[in-house]
């Protein structure tokens, strides 16, 4: 391994470790379900967590779980062969969500939203049935920023992608340990580790055009204005509720009362 490759590995492990610490993602005795899709991000997540597990001061279990949605031409042996060679505990859930979605969504319409909801429900149910305490997903820094702009531009909300959250059913905790990691570093890491990548377009659906627009915008910014992406990400960790317009976040009615109290204390 070259010096630059060694630095890459150390950087990613350090950033994942920092995210875990900052957001208290993993506790002693946790059973972590790493959702493995066969893409570069989930492979990197599993690989880095396994490395950190060896030196962690606490004990936690890792289970790699893949949901085989029965997409056409899905290479069913790639993940089992890789995981068995790796020696990690794993499970493959087989559920034909592809057929369900094809029956419910008219031809030409995007099926990503329904597919995602079905996938999430199946994984949440598996987690509950198997005593999983944390569900680990492979979203990285750029995913967070893209989601922020998607919500800003298309739904009118200041909302990104949380590093840690309680699921809608209040039964699962979802964590994103790669939240501080750059996608370009993960691409390099995947090549270095020679992960057996499974194509993401097996369902035959085109990429989300809105997300593609955002991704192209961010790439242009990164080229023309270095550090802009870093500044945007940093801003997501340094919100000032009193300087926004959301009355749910800040009680503007208290400003007069605070001013009166200040004047009384100053007299």
UniProtKB/Swiss-Prot annotation:
One of its GO terms (cellular component) is cytoplasm. The thiolation reaction likely consists of two steps: a first activation step by ATP to form an adenylated intermediate of the target base of tRNA, and a second nucleophilic substitution step of the sulfur (S) atom supplied by the hydrosulfide attached to the Fe-S cluster. The gene is ttcA. Catalyzes the ATP-dependent 2-thiolation of cytidine in position 32 of tRNA, to form 2-thiocytidine (s(2)C32). The sulfur atoms are provided by the cysteine/cysteine desulfurase (IscS) system. It catalyses: cytidine(32) in tRNA + S-sulfanyl-L-cysteinyl-[cysteine desulfurase] + AH2 + ATP = 2-thiocytidine(32) in tRNA + L-cysteinyl-[cysteine desulfurase] + A + AMP + diphosphate + H(+). It is found in: Cytoplasm. [4Fe-4S] cluster binds at residues 112, 115, 203. It holds the Pfam family ATP_bind_3. Its EC number is 2.8.1.-. It comes from Dichelobacter nodosus (strain VCS1703A). Homodimer. GO terms for biological process: tRNA thio-modification. A motif (PP-loop motif) lies at residues 37-42. Binds 1 [4Fe-4S] cluster per subunit. The cluster is chelated by three Cys residues, the fourth Fe has a free coordination site that may bind a sulfur atom transferred from the persulfide of IscS. InterPro entries: Rossmann-like_a/b/a_fold, TilS/TtcA_N, tRNA_Cyd_32_2_STrfase, tRNA_thiolation_TtcA_Ctu1. Belongs to the TtcA family. This is tRNA-cytidine(32) 2-sulfurtransferase. It is an enzyme of class 2 (transferase). GO terms for molecular function: 4 iron, 4 sulfur cluster binding; ATP binding; magnesium ion binding; sulfurtransferase activity; tRNA binding. HAMAP family: TtcA (MF_01850).
